[in-house]
Regions:
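S-adenosyl-L-methionine-dependent nucleic acid methyltransferase catalytic domains
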Residues: 1-190
Protein backbone atom coordinates (compact mmCIF):
# COMPACT_ATOMS: atom_id res chain seq x y z
CA UNK A 1 0.00 0.00 0.00
CA UNK A 2 1.09 3.56 -0.62
CA UNK A 3 0.64 4.44 3.05
CA UNK A 4 3.51 2.07 3.92
CA UNK A 5 5.77 3.90 1.46
CA UNK A 6 4.75 7.36 2.70
CA UNK A 7 5.09 6.43 6.38
CA UNK A 8 8.50 4.93 5.74
CA UNK A 9 9.68 7.94 3.77
CA UNK A 10 8.39 10.39 6.40
CA UNK A 11 9.74 8.17 9.20
CA UNK A 12 6.32 7.94 10.81
CA UNK A 13 4.85 5.10 12.79
CA UNK A 14 1.46 4.27 11.30
CA UNK A 15 -1.55 4.35 13.58
CA UNK A 16 -3.73 1.69 11.99
CA UNK A 17 -6.66 2.54 14.28
CA UNK A 18 -6.90 5.97 12.65
CA UNK A 19 -6.82 4.69 9.07
CA UNK A 20 -10.02 5.05 7.10
CA UNK A 21 -10.05 1.65 5.43
CA UNK A 22 -11.98 -1.57 5.14
CA UNK A 23 -10.00 -4.55 6.34
CA UNK A 24 -10.73 -8.26 6.48
CA UNK A 25 -8.62 -8.52 9.64
CA UNK A 26 -10.66 -9.57 12.67
CA UNK A 27 -8.27 -7.62 14.89
CA UNK A 28 -8.76 -4.27 13.18
CA UNK A 29 -12.59 -4.07 13.24
CA UNK A 30 -12.63 -2.03 10.03
CA UNK A 31 -15.82 -3.12 8.25
CA UNK A 32 -18.09 -1.08 5.96
CA UNK A 33 -19.97 0.44 8.92
CA UNK A 34 -16.72 1.62 10.52
CA UNK A 35 -15.58 2.97 7.13
CA UNK A 36 -18.83 4.92 6.70
CA UNK A 37 -18.57 6.35 10.22
CA UNK A 38 -14.87 7.25 9.77
CA UNK A 39 -15.49 8.92 6.39
CA UNK A 40 -18.35 10.98 7.79
CA UNK A 41 -16.24 11.99 10.80
CA UNK A 42 -13.42 13.08 8.48
CA UNK A 43 -15.76 15.09 6.25
CA UNK A 44 -17.35 16.72 9.31
CA UNK A 45 -13.88 17.81 10.42
CA UNK A 46 -13.08 19.12 6.93
CA UNK A 47 -16.33 21.11 7.05
CA UNK A 48 -15.47 22.47 10.50
CA UNK A 49 -12.05 23.82 9.51
CA UNK A 50 -12.72 24.82 5.89
CA UNK A 51 -13.85 28.42 5.34
CA UNK A 52 -17.20 29.03 3.65
CA UNK A 53 -17.14 28.71 -0.15
CA UNK A 54 -13.60 27.28 -0.10
CA UNK A 55 -12.64 24.04 -1.83
CA UNK A 56 -11.14 20.66 -1.14
CA UNK A 57 -10.41 17.78 -3.49
CA UNK A 58 -10.80 14.05 -3.06
CA UNK A 59 -9.46 11.18 -5.12
CA UNK A 60 -11.19 7.86 -4.78
CA UNK A 61 -11.25 4.39 -6.28
CA UNK A 62 -13.42 1.48 -5.25
CA UNK A 63 -15.21 -1.47 -6.76
CA UNK A 64 -17.75 -1.45 -3.94
CA UNK A 65 -20.99 0.45 -4.29
CA UNK A 66 -21.27 0.57 -0.50
CA UNK A 67 -17.92 2.39 -0.27
CA UNK A 68 -19.11 4.87 -2.91
CA UNK A 69 -22.30 5.30 -0.86
CA UNK A 70 -20.29 6.11 2.28
CA UNK A 71 -18.26 8.78 0.47
CA UNK A 72 -21.21 10.34 -1.37
CA UNK A 73 -23.42 10.43 1.74
CA UNK A 74 -20.63 12.07 3.78
CA UNK A 75 -20.29 14.77 1.11
CA UNK A 76 -24.04 15.36 0.94
CA UNK A 77 -24.60 15.34 4.74
CA UNK A 78 -21.82 17.89 5.15
CA UNK A 79 -23.19 20.11 2.35
CA UNK A 80 -20.23 19.97 -0.01
CA UNK A 81 -21.17 20.88 -3.58
CA UNK A 82 -19.34 19.50 -6.61
CA UNK A 83 -17.25 22.09 -8.43
CA UNK A 84 -15.36 19.71 -10.71
CA UNK A 85 -15.59 15.99 -11.38
CA UNK A 86 -12.87 14.28 -13.41
CA UNK A 87 -11.89 10.77 -14.29
CA UNK A 88 -8.17 10.09 -13.88
CA UNK A 89 -7.23 7.32 -16.25
CA UNK A 90 -4.07 5.37 -15.66
CA UNK A 91 -1.49 4.84 -18.37
CA UNK A 92 -1.27 1.18 -17.39
CA UNK A 93 -3.68 -0.90 -15.37
CA UNK A 94 -2.99 -3.57 -12.77
CA UNK A 95 -3.92 -7.09 -13.91
CA UNK A 96 -6.92 -7.04 -11.55
CA UNK A 97 -8.45 -4.16 -13.51
CA UNK A 98 -7.36 -5.36 -16.95
CA UNK A 99 -8.94 -8.78 -16.59
CA UNK A 100 -12.36 -7.61 -15.43
CA UNK A 101 -14.82 -5.94 -17.78
CA UNK A 102 -16.96 -4.98 -14.78
CA UNK A 103 -14.03 -3.20 -13.14
CA UNK A 104 -13.62 0.54 -12.78
CA UNK A 105 -10.26 1.54 -14.19
CA UNK A 106 -8.60 4.58 -12.67
CA UNK A 107 -9.67 7.08 -10.01
CA UNK A 108 -12.19 9.84 -9.71
CA UNK A 109 -11.01 13.32 -8.69
CA UNK A 110 -13.78 15.45 -7.21
CA UNK A 111 -13.38 19.06 -6.11
CA UNK A 112 -15.98 20.27 -3.62
CA UNK A 113 -17.01 23.67 -2.31
CA UNK A 114 -18.19 24.15 1.26
CA UNK A 115 -21.72 25.51 0.99
CA UNK A 116 -22.47 27.78 3.98
CA UNK A 117 -26.24 27.52 3.44
CA UNK A 118 -28.39 24.89 5.19
CA UNK A 119 -28.13 21.52 3.48
CA UNK A 120 -30.97 20.51 1.14
CA UNK A 121 -31.04 16.75 0.99
CA UNK A 122 -32.87 14.63 -1.51
CA UNK A 123 -33.88 11.54 0.44
CA UNK A 124 -35.44 8.50 -1.21
CA UNK A 125 -36.36 5.16 0.25
CA UNK A 126 -34.39 2.21 -1.12
CA UNK A 127 -37.10 1.24 -3.62
CA UNK A 128 -37.39 4.79 -4.99
CA UNK A 129 -33.62 5.12 -5.20
CA UNK A 130 -33.29 1.80 -7.03
CA UNK A 131 -35.93 2.93 -9.54
CA UNK A 132 -34.37 6.34 -10.23
CA UNK A 133 -30.87 4.83 -10.56
CA UNK A 134 -32.19 2.15 -12.92
CA UNK A 135 -33.90 4.86 -15.00
CA UNK A 136 -30.69 6.92 -14.99
CA UNK A 137 -28.63 3.91 -16.16
CA UNK A 138 -31.16 3.22 -18.93
CA UNK A 139 -30.93 6.84 -20.09
CA UNK A 140 -27.11 6.74 -19.90
CA UNK A 141 -26.97 3.58 -22.05
CA UNK A 142 -29.46 5.06 -24.53
CA UNK A 143 -27.15 8.10 -24.79
CA UNK A 144 -24.28 5.83 -25.85
CA UNK A 145 -22.34 5.42 -22.61
CA UNK A 146 -22.17 1.64 -22.24
CA UNK A 147 -18.88 0.79 -20.48
CA UNK A 148 -18.63 0.21 -16.73
CA UNK A 149 -16.39 3.25 -16.19
CA UNK A 150 -18.67 5.63 -18.04
CA UNK A 151 -21.84 4.40 -16.38
CA UNK A 152 -20.46 4.37 -12.82
CA UNK A 153 -18.81 7.78 -13.20
CA UNK A 154 -22.08 9.23 -14.56
CA UNK A 155 -24.08 7.74 -11.66
CA UNK A 156 -21.73 9.04 -8.99
CA UNK A 157 -21.49 12.53 -10.48
CA UNK A 158 -25.29 12.64 -10.71
CA UNK A 159 -25.63 11.57 -7.03
CA UNK A 160 -23.08 14.18 -5.89
CA UNK A 161 -24.55 17.01 -7.96
CA UNK A 162 -28.16 16.26 -6.96
CA UNK A 163 -27.31 15.86 -3.26
CA UNK A 164 -29.02 12.46 -3.08
CA UNK A 165 -28.73 10.45 0.12
CA UNK A 166 -28.16 6.80 -0.68
CA UNK A 167 -29.80 4.27 1.63
CA UNK A 168 -28.89 0.62 1.91
CA UNK A 169 -28.47 0.25 -1.86
CA UNK A 170 -25.37 -0.77 -3.80
CA UNK A 171 -25.45 0.96 -7.20
CA UNK A 172 -23.10 -1.68 -8.64
CA UNK A 173 -25.68 -4.32 -7.75
CA UNK A 174 -28.40 -2.39 -9.59
CA UNK A 175 -26.21 -2.35 -12.70
CA UNK A 176 -25.35 -6.05 -12.35
CA UNK A 177 -28.89 -7.27 -11.65
CA UNK A 178 -30.97 -5.10 -13.96
CA UNK A 179 -28.70 -4.77 -17.00
CA UNK A 180 -26.78 -7.20 -19.18
CA UNK A 181 -23.06 -7.08 -19.97
CA UNK A 182 -22.06 -8.23 -23.45
CA UNK A 183 -18.88 -10.18 -24.14
CA UNK A 184 -17.21 -7.07 -25.51
CA UNK A 185 -17.72 -5.21 -22.21
CA UNK A 186 -20.73 -3.05 -23.05
CA UNK A 187 -23.86 -2.85 -20.91
CA UNK A 188 -27.27 -3.33 -22.52
CA UNK A 189 -30.83 -2.90 -21.37
CA UNK A 190 -32.39 -6.31 -20.61
Amino acid sequence: EQSVIWNSWLRLEPNYNQEIVISDSNQRHKDIEAFENDINTAFSEIRRILKDNKHFSLTFHSLSGLEWKAVSNACVFNNFNVVDYEWLEQKTYPPRQLNRVKSIKGDVLVTFRKNPEPVRLRVCDDEQFTTIVSDFITETIENGITDTNGIMMAIMEWIFRNMIIVGNVDVFMILNKQFQLSEDGHWNIK
